[in-house]
Amino acid sequence: MRRPFMIRSSLTLIGVAAGLSLAACTSTENSNSNIEGTLSAAGASFPAAIYQRWFSDLAPQGIRVNYQSVGSGAGVRQFTAGTVDFGASDKPMKPEAIDKVSRGVVQIPMTAGAIAVAYNNSDCELKLTQDQLSGIFLGSIKNYSELGCDPKAIKIVHRSDGSGTTYNFTKHLSAISSEWKDNVGADKSVQWPSGIGAK
């Protein structure tokens, strides 16, 4: 039996304007900084709350940031298209994607978090092993009885859009399951072998 799992994901802030906002974050009340203006940004939903807090701390210094929590995939697309100053993604941009951005790309790790698998069965207390986790998402484990609980069908719900969380989760599944790695792989959007997609 393998140990219960924990998945950690790092979130990357992508953009040429990120340096400007980070420099402003480090200024103090006594700073003579004359940096001011408005930045537009879009991307990952996971870090949106901490970004909003950081950006509200910048507002009294004259720096406004409009961050739209639209998901990692949309954030990268908007940044690549030049419609936002910077984007945020749970998955770093690949070199071939970076090459498409003529103004350049700076990728900065901003924060980290864990991905949890939630379940809705009050009659069962689970600590999933890696084999059980991959079996559930591969569709080979279909019933709670296979996990030592009373019989009840397992209904899987996963992200349907391009998601950095999906990338990190499927990267973990690829690391713990050769079957997952060979048949599904890791990306922001994958062909899930089971379950229904939702946003």
Predicted regions and their residues:
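Bacterial N-terminal signal peptides that target proteins for export
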Residues: 1-13
